[in-house]
Amino acid sequence: MAKYMLIMRSNDEINAKFENIDFAEMLDTMGSFNDELMRAGVLRAAEGLEDAKDGVVVDFGGEIPVVTPGPYGETAALFNGFYILEVASIDEAVEWAKRMPMMQGAKAEIRRVPGIDEFPQDNEFIQREREWRERTGQL
């Protein structure tokens, strides 16, 4: 089994379609999908994000990081939320992604999350992280 992150991508035009949607309806729709993932035993994490205009961007392009309010540049590719699933293959992750609700016109990016065992085990910082994960029940 491997972990995959399903990244929900959108843009201003797509987000505008959902501005007037009933919030309770949205919660029910997303909650139903989340229930399916939980019943299948594949859901490890899921979070939606606040509007990009309420966030900040830290730009490391110069000598000193620059903090800018709101979305960075064009909002042609907003990151609206994510799922982390533990499934047998990227193909299975793709099948789950195809079922994500409320994605009309949007995109889902799927990326594998490497496990800690895939990193050099003799590295001091990997050892510290492994100990932290064991201590916090995240391993």
Model-derived regions: residue spans:
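Conserved, structured core segments of small domains
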Residues: 1-139
